[in-house]
Amino acid sequence: MGGIAINPDNTISGQVLETLNNYPELLRQKPPGTVLHRVQPSRYDANPVHYRADYRADSDTRYADPARQIGVYSLGFTAEVAVAESFQPGQGIDDQTVSLWRLKQASLHRLKAARVLNLVDVAALANRATHHKVRDIVQARGEGREGYALTQKSSQACMDIRKVDGLLYPSAVYMVTGSMQGCNLVLFEGRECQVDVVSHQLVMEPLLSNGETAAEFLESLGVVLE
């Protein structure tokens, strides 16, 4: 990835781009046909691929564009991680429940990569970063604008690289060591077609790969459904 321009007026952006420039192996490629999964309200079944830029100002979306100009589209590499990421109570709030009604009104979409996807490996970025602030960016936790300000700025820096389709990152709620099964990706708007739609079902209908329903799977993760 040699030749990436670094903006000296933006410290966070500069550090991220410098790290990517020094370590081109941080850009991972996923081949065409890679199966991906997404959970979203069933009312969007007719048009499931929608890149959102209009997150509220205090959004807790970790990798959204802070300028809200470029939309993002989040997916999971397995149905399990897509379900786990979509039905979690508010972070930092104990004993909060997830409504069973939400599960009944949601669909699980199956998609596939339309072409090679070039994704920045966020975990590898953390390992390779030589500046402390970059580590803070990719490991940040928190709620709302302050908690995710650094992660969103790092995402914004990657959005400026046209060859980058998005980010690859491990799930914080469904971790599978050494496997893509516990990973997510967020795709950036404005690139050549990235995904094709395959099929969808109501979240409550299919059995997951381990034989559990979505409700049983979430309960096994400690999510309280009501």
Q: Language-model segments: which ranges?
A:
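Active-site and NAD+-binding cores of ADP-ribose-processing enzymes
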Residues: 2-62, 91-226
